[in-house]
Regions:
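N-terminal subdomain of nucleotide-sugar transferases
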Residues: 1-40, 86, 227
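Membrane-proximal helix-turn-helix segments that form the acceptor-binding/catalytic region
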Residues: 18, 73, 77-81, 99, ...
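A short, active-site helix/loop in glycosyltransferases that binds the activated sugar's phosphate group
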Residues: 36, 123, 136, 140-172, ...
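Conserved donor-binding/catalytic core segment of Leloir-type glycosyltransferases
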Residues: 155, 199-215, 221-224
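A short helix/loop element that forms part of the nucleotide-sugar donor recognition site in Leloir-type
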Residues: 184-198
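Nucleotide-activated donor-binding/catalytic signature segment of Leloir-type glycosyltransferases, i.e.
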Residues: 247-274
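Short hydrophobic beta-strand element within catalytic cores of glycosyltransferases
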Residues: 282-283, 306-309
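Conserved acidic donor-binding segment of nucleotide-sugar-dependent glycosyltransferases
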Residues: 321-332, 340-346
């Protein structure tokens, strides 16, 4: 049960596609129930069922919205129908779909695998209502209820500690999503620089991802003048912009764009991202808060480029000072971290080589497939118990 538009090139659908691909390679038969929006994908053993779309929605934004709530209700109705017509080994439910799935799985006597890509209470922190008593307490209790009802929680890297604290008796694993190092020809990187209007020798600092508030892009924008004071030729590329994201960055970003030192690039297909990452001299993740590790960190590591990231527990779930420069989530600290890499090419090479080695050892496809097999074998044992 996936309450997302599938398939689209954005965080959770990307992760889910990898899980479905692995399950197919392992010979599992999977019925995916998802929103009525997105492109179909084909893997042996996979059937895709889509919830009804009575309002004829063509898109659904990231985050909470009335549109998403209506589609969630449609997904629940479809889930009841699927469980009434088929016999399943387990229910694998993502994000908010896990709450109704917990009740449905119990009613049908099958295990619940809760795929915790993020903490819902954490994601709702950006809304004012989430801070009005007793809403925070109620959200925490709802999350704890779900965690204690799940037979197995598979959480985004960084969330395992939260699960163990809230539900000590629940089995929990953390995802390590695959990202294979890829070789991008130097000529391709130069061509991309030309297309973006970047000088061939300008140091490039690149961010990729959403423009949500928790990503810390405000601090990154504030850090740019400090970086330019030390490295005047530096250029910043932010990939993933949409209209709302551009507006949220404010006037400071507009001034930097006019000055030619900042380029905002709309969301790119996943297949295009290796070229952007290879072009960069520094990859940056200024994330301010949130317990779930962003998928881009796995791609950053595989790219073999030096990483500057905020020193928060989310990043530390995978990154170390051997593979990244970890700094405080503040503009001056981000600037100092970026400049330290630009001024020491040998340090940048060491960080990039260590990052790529980590990806080679820990983020390979076969290793991921084995982990998915272990997860579903656990669920199968529980179904037979």
């Amino acid at each position: 049960m996936a309450p997302q538009p599938f398939y689209q090139d954005r965080g959770t659908p990307i992760a889910l596609r990898q899980v479905l691909h692995a399950a197919s390679e392992l010979g599992y038969r999977v019925d995916l129930l998802t929103f009525p929006i997105g492109a179909d994908v084909e893997f042996p053993g996979l059937r895709i069922f889509r919830a009804d779309n009575p309002f004829d929605f063509r898109a659904v934004p990231i985050g909470l919205s009335l549109r998403k709530l209506l589609l969630d209700a449609s997904l629940l109705a479809a889930a009841r129908g699927r469980l009434a017509s088929e016999t399943y080994t387990c229910v694998h439910a993502l994000e908010e779909a896990a709450w109704p799935a917990a009740l449905l799985a119990r009613r049908h006597g099958i295990p619940l695998l809760y795929d915790m890509q993020s903490s819902i209470p954490e994601q709702l922190r950006k809304y004012m209502l989430a801070h009005v008593p007793p809403v925070p307490m109620l959200m925490a209790r709802a999350e704890q209820w779900l965690l204690t009802r799940a037979d197995l929680v598979v959480a985004s890297a960084g969330l395992g500690t939260r699960v163990r604290r809230m539900a000590p008796g629940t089995r929990v694993r953390e995802w390590r999503f695959p990202s294979a190092p890829s070789e991008v020809p130097h000529e391709a990187s130069l061509a991309l620089r030309r297309r973006l209007g970047l000088p061939a020798d300008a140091p490039v600092i690149l961010y990729s991802g959403t423009f949500e508030a928790y990503q810390g892009l405000g601090e990154l924008i504030a850090a740019i003048p400090e970086v330019l004071a030390g490295e005047p030729s530096a250029r910043f590329i932010l990939v993933g912009a949409d209209r709302a994201g551009r507006a949220a960055l404010g006037g400071a970003a507009e001034e930097l764009e006019r000055a030619g030192v900042l380029t905002l690039v709309e969301r790119q297909p996943r297949s295009a991202m290796p070229g952007y990452l290879a072009m960069a001299d520094v990859l940056v993740s200024p994330r301010a808060f949130g317990g779930n590790l962003p998928l881009k960190i796995f791609d950053y590591l595989a790219a073999g480029r030096p990483i500057v990231a905020t020193n928060i527990s989310t990043h530390r779930a995978v990154l170390t000072r051997r593979t990244a420069v970890l700094v405080e989530p503040a503009a001056d600290a981000l600037a100092q971290g970026i400049v330290s890499v630009l001024r020491s090419p040998s340090k940048g090479r060491e960080l990039g080589e260590a990052a790529r080695q980590y990806a080679f050892e820990h983020l390979g496809w076969n290793r991921f497939v084995r982990s998915v097999g272990e997860i579903y074998e656990d669920a199968h044992r529980r179904a037979l118990a």
